[in-house]
Amino acid sequence: MKIGVFIPIGNNGWLISSNAPQYMPSFELNKAIVQQAEHYQFDFALSMIKLRGFGGKTEFWDHNLESFTLMAGLAAVTSRIKIYATAATLTLPPAIVARMASTIDSISNGRFGLNVVTGWQKPEYEQMGLWPGDEYFSRRYDYLSEYVEVLQDFWGTGQSDFNGEFFQMDDCRVSPQPQTPIKLICAAQSDAGMAFSAKYADYNFCFGKGVNTPTAFAPTAARLQKAAEQAGREVSSYVLFMIIADETDELARAKWESYKAGADTEALAWLTEQSGKDTQSGADTNVRQMADPTSAVNINMGTLVGSYANVAKMMDDIATVPGTEGILLTFDDFLSGIENFGQHIQPLMNSRADIVDTLPPAAREVA
């Protein structure tokens, strides 16, 4: 089972709460996080892109770094962990993204991959005059399909004459090409998004569901497998979970209850408002799940709350879901969370036993 870290490119990570750790994003923080993750043999690090936050008293996600430049820096200070940046495809022409990807591929010596997003939060793009109109909600995966086909031209031959509805290339060239194939990922849950991932992506990210219900996302993984079979490809799921762990279940639960009690209601109201803007894509989109009031304080990603031993067991349960190749992790406190994961959770996981055996001595004292 592969393990990755969803690094906090925006302020306060993924907890919309005044009772959660409050911090600004910085290169130094993310460098420490990714180097620590590499030390504990995490397989990859991913950063999102966010161009406008939710506001509220915590100013949630009002302060964000940029994904490609951050990951280029992190590629230069790591040696093994895979590095994924996110392209907000409405803001960056595919020829520029192809060249930036080739550059980070060079910096990382072949460790770079790309996450592509269509854009769901209208104010992010409207503020720059880049929103193409609300009809885009129903056409966004048509747009993204052309975008990726252009990328594939550049990474395959270094040249494109693509002529589509959204993109037209005229002997456009990108060189040098990547030294290794660029892995492409998407985070899709709608039917249109699943069809896109099945046709174009190497991996598809999905949300975990609920609190301490590690296999509840299984129907989503099954939908991807069905779509991939129809497309004649193999595409695996990577699932997003937040870990809130401590020495005992009671201590971990107390932290979770405190975070919920401090929920930033103004920021959450903004999220709910934005989730209703897309009336075209149906009820199964990521943003619909993010805004569900059940656990909106951490945008409704799956949450594992408990002792180190119980979290390890739930992580192993995730690994049993067919079609699941990896887990993307966030933490309430990233530095202490990764340390506790490496020292107290990973050594107890059957699904990471092969990794524990390869850790440096200082990282497997409890194994």
UniProtKB/Swiss-Prot annotation:
It holds the Pfam family Bac_luciferase. One of its GO terms (molecular function) is uracil oxygenase activity. The keyword DNA damage does not apply. It comes from the Bacteria. Keywords: Flavoprotein, FMN, Monooxygenase, NADP, Oxidoreductase. Its EC number is 1.14.99.46. It catalyses: uracil + FMNH2 + NADH + O2 = (Z)-3-ureidoacrylate + FMN + NAD(+) + H2O + H(+); thymine + FMNH2 + NADH + O2 = (Z)-2-methylureidoacrylate + FMN + NAD(+) + H2O + H(+). One of its GO terms (biological process) is uracil catabolic process. The FMN-N(5)-oxide reacts spontaneously with NADH to produce FMN. Requires the flavin reductase RutF to regenerate FMN in vivo. Belongs to the NtaA/SnaA/DszA monooxygenase family. RutA subfamily. This is Pyrimidine monooxygenase RutA. It comes from Yersinia enterocolitica serotype O:8 / biotype 1B (strain NCTC 13174 / 8081).
